[in-house]
């Protein structure tokens, strides 16, 4: 049973090593290849012209109805005439913005503009976030217009039949003001000259939520049928982090279907949907939720009326060598009789995935499961409370690094009864180690009798041989939950600790390989070995030396090299996670020392260290 315990610990450690190592040797090269491929692509400029003849039953990306618009009629989110067009060179972002008259967006959190030509929200930058820890570095740009290198925008409007010209990418709206603020909405109007007057009221709060209220008044002699839609479109596959613990790509909660997550690679494998060259998935008859595109820290999502049924869809389509990703919702038919009007209300989230902000939108706006916009992972029930605890102590101490230390200490105290029983059992096993060795020697050729004798010894001394596994097993979900919090929550981004750690979500910037910056080169990730990873490795080594070496020489070698392996593996992990592990190891050493002394068991740390270094000295002398 003692060997079973050791084997279990080794298996867990090796499993962790495989999972962590996968990112180094498999995922990272794939991500780099994708980045190089994307850099070689030329992004086409594009516009949008909502169709006069869309079959609404097929969703926003549906092919035009031949009876109404003909085979070349444009569709929302597509490039008019794209089938026969050729890609154009991308413009600089400022040049692309200058191609259309605009109304400024200016709030506490956002700056940007609304394009009057097309009526899109296609220019959004985040005031409170910068590209690096330097506050003078450029602000994060989230949305960009058609024609730029990385088009990413939101579009809202109507599709329908027998309605005449509908607002599209070439439509120039009339605005009632020159700025959109949290206190001053913007009203856009357009008369299609065929009896329909379109009015759009745009408002924005002091964070990242836009409200789009569309109305159509029918002044013509005939009834029309219209379908409201909202979409988020992204041209070109973006550079992704490429980690298995993080979702990047299409995301949504679609009515009763719940959370839907599709990576960019997964979209390429979907079945054809709608227009030729388009792949995707759709969910008709949904009510409530959202659909969008998410990055690690940022997202853009269209939010349909939470009480009205809609068809949701994720699509990928080909525009030359460029992939276009789109998340969209298409509402049900709205009949507009002569002299009548119809309204549709939708929202757009475009900003940082701040936990408090996202949670507040879910509660105040009643957006179904909107908090899942943040990728809390499988351990949601642990990960989110973990963040809440860290955030609580951050508000008390003003430092997330200190918060990590405090939460780790509280977790240690919370699990103290389990750990105490575990360490007491381990201490007792150390006390009977001579008897266990004698049993192994006495029944060396009879494993059955050896096990029976061991069990009798455990029963006599009241030892639980698997109790030592509990601290390791308990730490695994806590470790991954903290890793998830550090990795996906924007609150940890650019959060400093002390000294040289200016970003807990980034690796320790120092490296022993270049003598902590004295040598003028940057080592590769695999050789990136900062101060905190070294401290973690030392504490892990000391923790293992608290116990005698396993009798099996193979296991002893595994235990010897494990701290070295983990030191290199965690070298490129978030500094906050490495600090947690080092601090947790130190607390475990102190806890085990106290319990062993309390139970009258000799602490063999110094003896084991002395034995280890003496043995290595003897080996070197023998070789010499």
Swiss-Prot record:
Cell compartment(s), UniProt: Cell inner membrane
Q: Any transmembrane segments, and where?
A: 8-28, 370-390, 396-416, 470-490, 526-542, 559-579
> Which GO terms of the molecular function aspect are on file?
membrane insertase activity
Please classify the protein's predominant subcellular localization into one broad category. membrane
Q: Pfam families in the record, alphabetically?
A: 60KD_IMP, YidC_periplas
Q: Which InterPro entries match?
A: Membr_insert_YidC, Membr_insert_YidC_N, YidC/ALB3/OXA1/COX18, YidC/Oxa/ALB_C, YidC_ALB_C, YidC_periplasmic_sf
Superkingdom, according to UniProt?
Bacteria
Family that this chain belongs to:
Belongs to the OXA1/ALB3/YidC family. Type 1 subfamily.
Assembly description = Interacts with the Sec translocase complex via SecD. Specifically interacts with transmembrane segments of nascent integral membrane proteins during membrane integration.
Q: What is this protein called?
A: Membrane protein insertase YidC
Native species: Methylobacterium sp. (strain 4-46)
Supply the source organism's classification: Bacteria, Pseudomonadati, Pseudomonadota, Alphaproteobacteria, Hyphomicrobiales
């Amino acid at each position: 049973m003692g060997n079973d315990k050791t084997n279990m610990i080794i298996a867990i450690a090796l499993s962790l090593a495989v999972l962590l190592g996968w990112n180094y040797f498999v995922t990272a090269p794939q991500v780099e290849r994708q980045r190089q491929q994307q850099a070689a692509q030329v992004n086409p400029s594009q516009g949008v012209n909502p169709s006069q003849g869309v079959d609404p039953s097929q969703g926003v990306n549906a092919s035009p109805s031949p009876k109404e618009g003909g085979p070349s009629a444009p569709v929302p989110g597509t490039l008019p005439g794209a089938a026969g067009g050729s890609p154009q060179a991308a413009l600089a972002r400022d040049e692309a913005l200058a191609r259309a008259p605009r109304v400024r967006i200016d709030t506490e959190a956002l700056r940007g503009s609304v394009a009057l030509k097309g009526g899109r929200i296609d220019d959004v930058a985040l005031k409170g976030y910068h590209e690096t820890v330097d506050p003078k570095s450029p602000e994060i740009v989230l949305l960009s217009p058609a024609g730029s290198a990385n088009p990413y925008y939101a579009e809202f409007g109507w599709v329908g039949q027998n309605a005449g010209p509908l607002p599209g990418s070439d439509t120039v709206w009339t605005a009632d003001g020159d700025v959109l603020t949290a206190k001053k909405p913007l009203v856009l109007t357009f008369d299609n000259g065929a009896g329909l007057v379109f009015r759009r009221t745009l408002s924005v709060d002091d964070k990242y939520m836009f409200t789009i209220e569309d109305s159509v008044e029918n002044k013509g002699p005939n009834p029309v049928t219209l379908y409201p839609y909202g979409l988020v479109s992204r041209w070109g596959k973006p550079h992704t982090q490429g980690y298995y613990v993080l979702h990047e790509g299409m995301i949504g909660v679609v009515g009763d279907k719940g959370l839907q997550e599709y990576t960019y690679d997964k979209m390429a494998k979907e079945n054809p949907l709608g227009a030729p060259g388009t792949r995707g998935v759709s969910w008709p008859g949904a009510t409530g939720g959202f659909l969008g595109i998410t990055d690690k820290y940022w997202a853009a999502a269209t939010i349909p009326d939470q009480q009205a049924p809609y068809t949701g869809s994720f699509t990928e389509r080909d525009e030359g060598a460029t992939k276009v990703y789109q998340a969209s919702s298409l509402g049900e038919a709205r009949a507009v009789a002569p002299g009548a009007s119809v309204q549709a209300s939708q929202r757009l989230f475009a900003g940082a995935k701040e936990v408090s902000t996202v949670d507040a939108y879910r509660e105040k706006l009643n957006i179904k499961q909107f908090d899942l916009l943040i990728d809390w992972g499988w351990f949601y029930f642990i990960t989110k409370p973990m963040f809440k605890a860290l955030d609580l102590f951050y508000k008390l101490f003003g430092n997330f690094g200190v918060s990590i230390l405090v939460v780790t200490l509280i977790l240690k105290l919370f699990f103290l009864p389990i750990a105490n029983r575990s360490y007491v059992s381990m201490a007792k096993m150390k006390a009977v180690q001579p008897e266990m060795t004698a049993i192994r020697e006495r029944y060396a050729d009879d494993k059955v009798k050896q096990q029976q004798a061991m069990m009798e010894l455990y029963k006599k001394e009241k030892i639980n041989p698997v109790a030592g596994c509990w601290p390791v097993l308990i730490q695994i979900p806590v470790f991954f939950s903290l890793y998830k919090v550090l990795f996906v929550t924007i609150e940890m981004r650019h959060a400093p600790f002390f000294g040289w750690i200016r970003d807990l979500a980034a690796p320790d910037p120092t490296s022993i390989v270049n003598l902590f910056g004295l040598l003028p080169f940057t080592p590769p990730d695999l050789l990136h070995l900062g101060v905190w990873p070294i401290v973690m490795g030392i504490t892990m080594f000391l923790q293992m030396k608290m116990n005698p070496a396993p009798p099996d020489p193979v296991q002893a070698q595994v235990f010897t090299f494990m701290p070295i392996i983990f030191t290199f593996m965690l070298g490129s992990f978030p500094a906050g996670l490495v600090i947690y592990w080092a601090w947790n190891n130190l607390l475990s050493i102190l806890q085990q020392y106290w319990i062993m002394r309390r139970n009258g068991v000799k602490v063999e740390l110094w003896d084991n260290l002395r034995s280890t270094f003496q043995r290595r000295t003897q080996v070197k002398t023998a070789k010499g």
